[in-house]
């Protein structure tokens, strides 16, 4: 029974950590969007979009790792 309780505690800690990581990615993506929308420079907008795409890809990879 103790092993199950330890497992449940570790699982909950991992879930909480994952939620925090996902929130961080969400905030970073939102900041890049704001930066992109505020800029009238095409190069800066393109860089922001690349950053957003990369952050989304990393976030999705983490989600797939956690689910799979």
Predicted ranges, named:
Residues 2-26:
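Short, charge/polar-rich alpha-helical segments
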Residues 24-68:
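Short, charge-rich amphipathic interface segments used for partner binding and complex assembly
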């Amino acid at each position: 029974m103790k092993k199950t309780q330890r497992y449940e505690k570790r699982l909950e800690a991992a879930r909480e950590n994952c939620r925090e990581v996902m929130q961080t990615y969400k905030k970073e993506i939102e900041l890049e969007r704001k930066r992109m929308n505020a800029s009238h420079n095409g190069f800066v907008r393109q860089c922001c979009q690349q950053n957003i795409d990369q952050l989304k890809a990393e976030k999705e990879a983490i989600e797939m790792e956690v689910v799979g």
